[in-house]
A protein has these predicted regions:
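Non-catalytic DNA-recognition/assembly elements of restriction-modification systems
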Residues: 128-207
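Polybasic, glycine- and aromatic-enriched phosphate-binding surface used to engage nucleic acids
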Residues: 1-142, 146
Length: 207
């Protein structure tokens, strides 16, 4: 993410009383600023307040900001030691390996609307950037650079059509895991996950 899609108010501005709709805007700011600072991170992940896996606007489950940002309540703030580490973890978070385990451990809200509790996320397997060799890190970061500005279709269409960008991410992650796409049965996994998302959508009606 390069251009911010929204703004957070962190100080007073002229004639701002209607905006706050409160008798003590300064008190709101005093309480809000430490909280915002505590949630700042390079890596932000969907699913804290549910995400629709079948929605046309759902392309990724995590994104990276070049500067730490405090996300809204809809997102998890994933703390990392550096921007590079955030990029490596973003590849994992948007990989099909992670999507599969997320779908197996979701809190289902209805149909394809899913979310994940903090305790659940702490139990899941995660790629450890600190355990990667310099060569594997370099290859993963090259994949990130190659695809970071490329528009991706919806998550469901990525799976249905075996989108090359998803293949590229999964190929790099598979190599970091010491395997390959064929060994891990990734093409078939795409089809299974797409069918499952479509089934969830159709059971509850098209969201």
């Amino acid at each position: 993410m390069v251009d911010p899609p929204d703004y957070i108010v962190i100080e007073r501005f002229p004639d701002d009383e209607p905006f706050w709709d409160d008798r003590s805007p300064d008190s709101i700011l005093r309480a809000r600023l430490p909280h915002l600072a505590s949630r700042e991170a390079y890596l932000v992940a969907a699913g804290r307040n549910n995400v629709n896996l079948a929605a046309p606007g759902t392309h990724f489950l995590a994104f990276v900001s070049p500067v730490p940002i405090p996300p809204t309540w809809s997102f998890w703030s994933i703390k990392t030691d550096s921007l590079e580490e955030a990029r490596l973890l973003a590849l994992w978070w948007n990989s099909t390996f992670h999507l599969a385990q997320l779908m197996e451990n979701q809190t289902e809200v209805g149909g394809t609307w899913l979310g994940w509790l903090r305790a659940t996320l702490h139990r899941l397997l995660v790629l450890n950037p600190k355990a990667l060799s310099p060569e594997l890190k370099r290859e993963l970061l090259e994949t990130y650079e190659a695809w970071k500005s490329v528009p991706f279709p919806s998550l469901l269409d990525q799976l249905r059509n075996h989108f090359e960008g998803r293949f590229a991410i999964d190929r790099s992650v598979a190599k970091a895991l010491g395997s390959s796409l064929g060994d891990l049965g990734i093409p078939a996994l795409y089809d299974r996950l797409a069918a499952r998302i479509e089934a969830l959508r159709d059971v509850m009606g098209r969201d």
